[in-house]
Design a protein with these regions (language model features):
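Bacterial N-terminal signal peptides
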Residues: 11-24
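Beta-rich, blade/repeat-based domains predominating
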Residues: 31-44, 75-90, 118-131, 160-171, ...
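Short loop/turn segments immediately following the C-termini of beta-strands
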Residues: 52, 98, 139, 179, ...
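Conserved beta-propeller blade signature
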Residues: 46-48, 92-94, 133-135, 173-176, ...
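A short loop-to-beta-strand structural motif that recurs across blades of beta-propeller domains
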Residues: 56-59, 102-105, 143-146, 183-185, ...
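Blade-level signature of beta-propeller repeat domains, shared across WD40, Kelch, NHL, RCC1
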Residues: 251, 256-285
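Short loop/turn segments that connect beta-strands within beta-propeller blades
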Residues: 60-64, 106-111, 147-152, 187-192, ...
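A short beta-strand motif characteristic of beta-propeller blades
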Residues: 29, 66-76, 111-117, 152-158, ...
Length: 285
């Protein structure tokens, strides 16, 4: 009986601790994006942002942000470590998450549906071909996987050293940003890769966009720049310096490039002339 007060105090302390811990696993709504890594844009001019720190996904429409999906702080829950976004051939949003080792498709209810049952490692980038197949750059195992449009078991497409970003061009050829000996690769008709840019001209390439003319734009995080790679020419800086601070994600919207930069505290837009501008976050009420 003498131990009862101590026991009761211990139980009370444990209750408070567990309540506090559990509360920490449920993210409070963020006032604005905290650490944006990925970006995607659909045909309706909506822009989507992967927020690694919140964690979750924001949607920007008419220049204003709203929360599309908020994940949990609990590890191995959907989008706890969201890293990349893409739009599929039907206009649906895709997201890659390393916490659950999976990629997701968002339904009409804005809820993510897993597509591979956790059979991936670290999905860094997703690209979709004209047939609707999903291609995933898996940084953990240095492979690119092909996933059926409806989901299913990933099939090995290629082994590439440290694949960071993927994109398809208008000819349905897959381009890959690699951190291997050749940093920019492209798959031919036989699915074998050739070096578009031999060697390592970039500091830390992290994203790629290819326009209708076959010109590639490569986001370079450490160089605080976006490079332009035209056919038969060496890479040239297309935009560099402020407002670019630590650019990691990039997507096309019309003739412009939209850049996700976790340290810029806003959306960066680069026009066709290479002029970059920053729009501060505006969250819809």
């Amino acid at each position: 009986m003498r131990q009862f007060p101590r026991t009761r105090a211990a139980v009370a302390w444990a209750t408070v601790f567990l309540a506090t811990f559990s509360a920490g696993l449920t993210s409070a709504p963020a006032a604005q994006p905290l650490y944006v890594l990925g970006i995607a844009a659909d045909s309706a001019s909506n822009v989507y942002l992967a927020d690694r720190e919140m964690p979750g996904v924001w949607r920007m429409s008419d220049g204003k942000l709203s929360l599309l999906f908020q994940g949990s702080k609990k590890f191995r829950t959907p989008l706890n470590a969201v890293r990349c976004l893409a739009i599929d051939h039907q206009g649906k949003l895709l997201a890659g998450d390393s916490a659950t080792r999976d990629i997701y498709r968002f339904g009409d209810d804005n809820q993510p549906v897993p597509l591979t049952k956790g059979q991936l490692g670290i999905p860094m980038s997703i690209a979709v071909n004209k047939a609707g197949d999903l291609f995933v750059a898996d940084l953990e195992v240095h492979r690119i996987f092909k996933v059926p449009s409806a989901g299913g078991e990933p099939a090995l497409f290629a082994q590439v050293q440290a694949p960071r970003a993927l994109a398809f061009d208008h000819e349905d050829r897959l381009w890959v940003v690699s951190h291997g000996k050749d940093q920019l690769l492209r798959a031919g008709a036989d699915d074998k890769f050739e070096a578009v840019v031999p060697g390592r001209p970039f500091e830390f390439p992290s994203a790629i966009v290819v326009d209708e003319q076959g010109t590639a734009f490569v986001c370079d995080t450490y160089a605080k720049a976006v490079w332009k790679v035209s056919s038969g020419k060496p890479p040239e800086k297309f935009a560099s310096g402020a407002p670019l601070v630590s650019p990691v994600g990039m997507v096309r919207q019309g003739a412009d490039l939209l850049v996700a930069d976790p340290r810029a505290k806003g959306l960066i837009r680069i026009d066709a002339a290479g002029k970059a501008s920053l729009s501060a976050w505006t969250v819809a009420e």
